[in-house]
């Protein structure tokens, strides 16, 4: 399900409205972008609809393959619902990460959750960034406020 990319510059997990638009924006800027989604059947249609930008995108059905496809140190943008889904994702992805890797929570999380998550990363050698994304689908595709 992957394009012919060996190593992505960044990963975007979550191909809903905002995640898919951000992935296309990054690809349009020349970045090699690995993408994945909880429902893997969203990946192939996304790549098909990407048109010529698909050459900068690689789709991955499993979290393990997704993480492995990103150049180290990894930067992974999660565009998933805030709260419990993000906590569960952190638990799932942490064993797959290496020192120096960065997780970016692009959901609009409560700042208390962001502080708690960042504190949990202290001393792990991995990094957590809470980054809200504003501008809706058009902003995400053409120039979001982050």
Where are each of the predicted segments found?
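Rossmann-fold dinucleotide-binding core
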Residues: 86-91, 109-146
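Residue-level recognition of oxygen-bearing side chains
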Residues: 65, 75, 85, 116
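Glycine/proline-rich, positively charged
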Residues: 81-84, 97-100
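Redox-cofactor binding/interface segments in oxidoreductases and associated redox assembly factors
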Residues: 77-79, 105
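NAD(P)+-binding Rossmann beta1-loop-alpha1 motif at the extreme N-terminus of oxidoreductases
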Residues: 2-68, 72-74, 100, 129, ...
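A short helix->loop->beta-strand "cap" motif at the edges of active sites that frequently abuts
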Residues: 98-101, 124-126
